Amino acid sequence: MKKLSLLLASLCALFLVACSNQKQADGKLNIVTTFYPVYEFTKQVAGDTANVELLIGAGTEPHEYEPSAKAVAKIQDADTFVYENENMETWVPKLLESLDKKKVKTIKATGDMLLLPGGEEEEEGHDHGGEGHHHDYDPHVWLSPARAIKLVEHIRDSLSADYPDKKETFEKNAAAYIEKLQVLDKAYTDGLSQAKQKSFVTQHAAFNYLALDYGLKQVSISGLSPDAEPSAARLAELTEYIKKNKISYIYFEENASQALANTLSKETGVKLDVLNPLESLTEEATKDGEDYISVMEKNLKALKQTTDQEGPEIEPEKEENTKTVHNGYFEDADVKDRTLSDYVGNWQSVYPFLEDGTFDQVFDYKAKLTGKMTKDEYKAYYRKGYQTDVTKINITDNTMEFVQGGQSKKFTYKY
């Protein structure tokens, strides 16, 4: 149904664009962005060279957004369309199929950034029935100041490549903004590096990258809405969990109702605060001078109410134990003798990718997640295991061909 609605919107947009296809009279670029962080970062880089438009305003859930015909028309009439990642704006891949690439340049803000595995997010405070939404990969990279810098850098480089006559301006604007983000990053590093409590509990599981980059552990909690009190049964469960783990604060993505705060405080002693996922910024907040940096500063202040207090590591309320082969689960029927034909194909050695830095993000993640080795130690470890002078292996039904330095040797496999 979503694909059909997007197709109809695209068809309608063709007519709308035909009627409104006029470039900016002031000679500026016309850039359309999806949601707030992308808008803010693009605006900071483009500066006075462009009119930057925000597609998804406050009050609209970016995860659930589907573009109208009017929205598609805006994108198709733009010089550049900037989005964050297809795991956030799930409608974008379908849109790009019908977009005139010669006319509209597109920028994926995350570029080739490696994303963490995603999962189910439960946000019962929204108007979509509390069903949550699933990401194959977690797109919330903007909530780590360190990664926000990388988003800005990629937007800068992409705009510079597309509009080389404006490259100097883009670089100057980006440098000024990145300097502010670096101050923010340092504030997070200094404020959280000596955290007495490394775990924090949140109703919106959007802070994985923030936790990863600053040495914390996000623990998400389900069954809580900021504007409704939990059932008696759920309240009993929460009371036991909160007291067992000595939880002082639970973070919501928006201000919780006073009734909920009073109920939880009375039953458990826990306090409620806000960690803003910055998916949007209200007009009122903008008028008050709020922006990405000021909101992230407030998030840090809120986090420190937990991290500055001594406390035990907080365990997840419900430990997930998915039965997958990766986790050591398989049926006897899954075990079978395999023939060479099961592996037919042209296989590439991963060693060159290790050497050229392609895997560096993987080693960085692994180092932060496990704490067992540094990223450089992981790279050295895998270099030793993966090193080979065979660049390719080509497999047919019963032959294996090893390619090495432009020469190849073929062998027949006997089962």
Located regions from the model:
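Positively charged n-region of N-terminal signal peptides that target proteins for export
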Residues: 1-8
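Extracytoplasmic metal-acquisition and chelation regions
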Residues: 5, 19-330, 334, 346
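Beta-strand cores of secreted/periplasmic/IMS beta-sandwich domains, seen most often
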Residues: 82-84, 341, 346-352, 392-401
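Pocket-lining segment of extracytoplasmic ligand-binding domains
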Residues: 206, 224, 368-384
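Amphipathic/hydrophobic helical signal segments and adjacent flexible N-terminal regions
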Residues: 318-373
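Contiguous, well-ordered beta-strand patches that form the walls/edges
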Residues: 377-415
